[in-house]
Amino acid sequence: MDKHIPVLLDESIKYLNIKLNGIYVDCTLGRAGHASEILKRLSQNGFLYAIDQDKTAIGQAKEKLEKISNNFFLIQGNFSNLSALLAINHIFSVDGILYDLGVSSPQLDIGSRGFSYRIDGPLDMRMDITNNNLTADTIINQYSETQIEDILFKYGEESFAKSIAKKIVLSRPINSTLQLVEVIKSALPQKVLKQKKHPAKKTFQALRIFINNELIVLENSLKQALDLLNSKGRICVITFHSLEEKIVKNIFNSSTNYFQEQLFNNLPIKANLNSQFKLVIKKPIKPSLLELENNHRSHSAKLWVIEKN
């Protein structure tokens, strides 16, 4: 099992601009790396709420956080229901919200959950095994070649979606993650197999996003998060691929009325009109060279920050 190191930890804590007495939400608890650092910075009057779909993650995080403070409450649920999950606890406004969108909670290192292309396991990939009946097995073994191709292209941005989909259908039945990896490899040219990135990464990403409806969930949650912020409250989002980036960028830019247009003489105009929100940083923050060396999970990570005026 990899040692889990939180991605962009110092940067996200810095830009969350934590107030001693504030109320904060970690929407992606995972192994509580970010949550621990938030909790350390709160006084006895501050409070942390943290959300995760995974019961195992909740249990492990509880033990870790209790060593720091008791000023927290862990919620098992999907952050698409952010407002409702907080309302149940009589919370209707907060000072900061954090999203770490990387799959870094315990599921990734447990083969039986089916998320890993390095550890053998069943074709599952459900974040919420209680309420979601759609598994990777269903897609891989029952969906049409065209449907699979569309999923891989749309959600994995996989250039070889067509050849991979064709090979998957020809290789059925496919019963495990590592068997799927071999099928994917057999569909790719040698030049791709020699690249640094794992050849199955994009396919597994596509399946995971589709099964868990991740993009719509993120969009819905961010809109709720904006409504929950107190004045000077901030949202920090750590993204890991261009599909997430596009959603965050669109929502943040539209919320701040931040735009760029071209005049007839090709001079760009940038404006931040009167708005409830402002972009704290105009361009997302990327990991330092040191972090990239020490934490392979940080590759492609970007931090985005917005503040309510």
Swiss-Prot record:
Q: Where in the cell is it found?
A: Cytoplasm
Q: Which family does it belong to?
A: Belongs to the methyltransferase superfamily. RsmH family.
Instruction: Tell me the name of the encoding gene.
Output: rsmH
Q: Indicate where this protein is primarily found.
A: cytoplasm
Classification via InterPro entries: RsmH (IPR002903), SAM-dep_MeTrfase_MraW_recog (IPR023397), SAM-dependent_MTases_sf (IPR029063)
Do the record's keywords include S-adenosyl-L-methionine? yes
Q: Give the catalysed reaction(s), semicolon-separated.
A: cytidine(1402) in 16S rRNA + S-adenosyl-L-methionine = N(4)-methylcytidine(1402) in 16S rRNA + S-adenosyl-L-homocysteine + H(+)
Q: Which UniProt keywords apply?
A: Cytoplasm, Methyltransferase, rRNA processing, S-adenosyl-L-methionine, Transferase
> Which Pfam family, any one of them, does this sequence belong to?
Methyltransf_5
Q: Which residues bind S-adenosyl-L-methionine?
A: A32, G33, H34, D52, F79, D100, Q107
Q: Which residues form a coiled coil?
A: none
Molecular function terms, GO-annotated: rRNA (cytosine-N4-)-methyltransferase activity
Biological function: Specifically methylates the N4 position of cytidine in position 1402 (C1402) of 16S rRNA.
Q: What is this protein called?
A: Ribosomal RNA small subunit methyltransferase H
The answer to whether the entry has keyword Hydrolase is: no
An annotated GO BP: rRNA base methylation
Task: List the top taxonomic levels of the source.
Answer: Bacteria, Bacillati, Mycoplasmatota, Mollicutes, Mycoplasmataceae
Enzyme Commission code(s) on record: 2.1.1.199
Q: Which GO terms describe its cellular component?
A: cytoplasm
Q: Which organism is it from?
A: Mycoplasma capricolum subsp. capricolum (strain California kid / ATCC 27343 / NCTC 10154)
